[in-house]
Amino acid sequence: KLFRFGGEHNHFIEGEDKEVKVIEVDGIKIALLICFELRFKNLWAQIEGADIVAVPSWWGGLRTEHFKSLTQTLAIMNQCYVIASDSLNDDCSKMSGIVNPKGEVTRNGDRELLEIP
């Protein structure tokens, strides 16, 4: 995690390596952006070429539209799948979902289970 948000400095140490790596598993290139890292386009450039970008988060409910827009834009800009997870905590956006490279979205909203048909 490169950026600490809110009170996270009480529990986490900022990462030392400012470069985001893309790993390959069975021919699939996978990258990880943790929560607030989603907001930095210089990090998007570092993961260009990834097939899948995972975004685990604890995204505040007041910024729900930001989370939705950023994950969708990341998928379109990098032509990749974005798998975004967020907490079901009442203070969070509850917008876990999968965005395809065309920007088409399947999200769980306030449901407890995300099902892909």
What are these regions (language model features)?
Residues 1-48, 63-65, 69:
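Active-site catalytic loop in hydrolytic enzyme cores
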Residues 39-113:
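CN hydrolase (nitrilase-like) catalytic-core segments centered on the catalytic cysteine
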Residues 115-117:
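Exposed aromatic-hydrophobic patches
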